[in-house]
A protein has these predicted regions:
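Hydrophobic membrane-insertion alpha-helices, especially the h-region
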Residues: 1-5
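Residues marking helix boundaries in flexible regions
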Residues: 6-8, 199
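Short, compositionally biased "basic patch" segments
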Residues: 8-10, 14, 20-23, 133-146
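Active-site beta->alpha N-cap acidic-glycine motif
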Residues: 14-111, 118, 125-126, 198, ...
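Catalytic domains of cell-wall/extracellular-matrix polysaccharide-remodeling enzymes
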Residues: 98-207, 212-217
């Protein structure tokens, strides 16, 4: 869903939704010749693992996209400031990780607005992108929030296993050009898997970009 326009390019997966908001290039090289891929992290900031992740991303020269929970933003503003200072893209993931479709429009908008306000308080910018929990968005909110919904192409279900090798293999085996990878920064195994994914895909010639560059470049 992009500015209220449905793009019928949704891919099925084991989770409630597994799709991206823009069509895939199906392996066709981009105009600038780069093989692009975006790595994204949900549910942060996490006091134990986000800084570890940021250090590894910086070491590898990678820019990522973080979809943050408002309640965690309020608890760990310094980590949010670090994410922003490192040049990563920050999006909204709701305030309390609730299924927005189960809420009234007013309550759903509050989940978004409270998170956006918390992020703005730290970064001075309001997020433009939202990844709704479970991939469940209320389409009529497109006109209320003016945010761009971003889902995903590859979901290794990293929250179901503590084996970083398994997580990494699930991604590397499936990922393609212009795909958006879904991970979380709430466990050591997910962070280690992210590093393994990045290292392997960089060896394969991929360049990591933010979701904004996937959607609009």
């Amino acid at each position: 869903m992009l500015f209220g326009i449905s793009i019928e390019n949704r891919k099925s997966a084991e989770t409630m939704a597994s799709a991206v908001t823009m069509p895939s290039s199906d392996g066709i090289p981009s105009i600038d010749g780069m093989k692009k891929v975006a790595i994204t992290f949900d549910d942060g900031p996490n006091p134990d693992y986000t800084e570890m992740l940021l250090a590894g991303l910086k070491e590898r020269g990678v820019k990522a996209t973080f979809f943050l929970l408002g309640k965690e933003v309020e608890k760990y503003p310094d980590i949010v400031a670090d994410i922003y200072a490192e040049g990563h893209l920050i999006g909204t993931h709701s305030y309390e990780h609730v299924n927005l479709k189960n809420l009234s429009d007013t309550a759903a908008i509050e989940q978004v607005d409270k998170t956006n306000a918390a992020i703005h308080e730290i970064t001075g910018e309001y997020p433009e992108y939202i990844r709704p929990p479970f991939g469940c968005w209320k389409c009529n909110l497109d006109y209320e929030t003016k945010m761009i919904e971003v889902l995903w192409d590859v979901d290794p279900l990293d929250w179901k296993t503590s084996n970083s090798d398994v997580i990494a293999k699930r991604v590397v085996d499936k990922v393609g050009e212009n795909d958006i990878i879904l991970l979380h920064d709430a466990s050591e195994s997910s962070v280690k898997a992210a590093f393994k994914i990045i290292d392997e895909l960089q060896r394969e010639g991929y360049t990591f970009v933010t979701v904004e560059e996937i959607l609009f470049d």
